Amino acid sequence: MEYSNLRRQIIFMKKNLFDQGYLDEQFNQLEELQDESSPNFVEEVAALFFKDSSRLLTNIEQAIDKYPQDFYRLDSLVQQLKGSGSSIGALRMKNECSVFKVNCNDRNLEGCRRSLQKMKREHATLKQKLESYFQLLRQVGPRDYAVSSRK
């Protein structure tokens, strides 16, 4: 695919990630940190996020299934997940973590379960969308290491 078409596709894809609420300004800030000396910085940070957040989601699921539920532990785990999501600009993940925390504070186990399922879906969707985005970035190569198109 021609370079300019790829670039347009990347800009369009990124704009959609923002318009659909998957990402927030923190993602742009991460991209601004990326430079020629670390052309895959954002992709590497995202990979670390997905590894860590997968572990946290598993831990949350195990804590929900453990009886009696330890809502303080659940709150702590979700706070970690929310912080991780915030660090890469995962807006929908961060927002669903906030909903989970409200359910947790209310001791609403069923609400926590629903929020967990939504967090898992948002996590999987964001991972798929960012993998596609990074794949396009790899196709244009290091000459365009930061596509800093504002949304």
Curated annotation (Swiss-Prot):
One of its GO terms (cellular component) is nucleus. GO terms for molecular function: histidine phosphotransfer kinase activity; protein histidine kinase binding. Keywords: Cytokinin signaling pathway, Two-component regulatory system. SUPFAM superfamilies: Histidine-containing phosphotransfer domain, HPT domain. PROSITE patterns: HPT. Disruption phenotype: Dwarf, narrow leaf, low fertility and small grain phenotypes. The keyword Acyltransferase does not apply. Residues 38-133 form the HPt domain. One of its GO terms (biological process) is phosphorelay signal transduction system. PANTHER family: HISTIDINE-CONTAINING PHOSPHOTRANSFER PROTEIN 4 (PTHR28242:SF43), PHOSPHORELAY INTERMEDIATE PROTEIN YPD1 (PTHR28242). Functions as a two-component phosphorelay mediator between cytokinin sensor histidine kinases and response regulators (B-type ARRs). Plays an important role in propagating cytokinin signal transduction. This is Pseudo histidine-containing phosphotransfer protein 2. It comes from Oryza sativa subsp. japonica (Rice). The gene is PHP2.
